[in-house]
Amino acid sequence: MTASKKNNFIDFIEVYGDNPVAFVEEVLGATPLEWQKQFLRDIARGERRISVRAGHGVGKSTACSWALIWHMVTRYPQKGVVTAPTAPQLFDALFAELKSWINKLPPVLKDSFEVFSDKIAFKAAPESSFISARTSSKERPEALAGVHSENVLLIVDEASAVYEEVF
């Protein structure tokens, strides 16, 4: 490639790689609340344990979905894992919200992913870059084992009901 050719992907990463708020606003066309912006900034800074305490219907699943999509689009290789204590909590709320936001991506990004019932994979490298949904319970602490990558994002919904043995 010559120096005069523009690489849109590199430009995209330069703009959004460290700025998930701009990604949400400009790529997904959404307007995050202030607490959601702070949550996204904390993830971008690499904070390891972020707790969001909020009531029902305030946008936690939405903010987590945005973070997972931003992470998947701007990091490679990467693995995202979403977990909750029960399948209904995981699939009826968080993973359903994640899928709805994947569908709102611009076609050039949306078409890069394959959506399954329990996984979203980067088509070009499905083993290296994906988001998987896994229930976690005290009886199955191994559910989160084996997730290795340069970039891992773990989202735990209803974390207060997930036993410490799982981690």
Cite the ranges covered by each PLM segment.
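Phosphate/NTP-binding elements of NTP-utilizing enzymes
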Residues: M1-F167
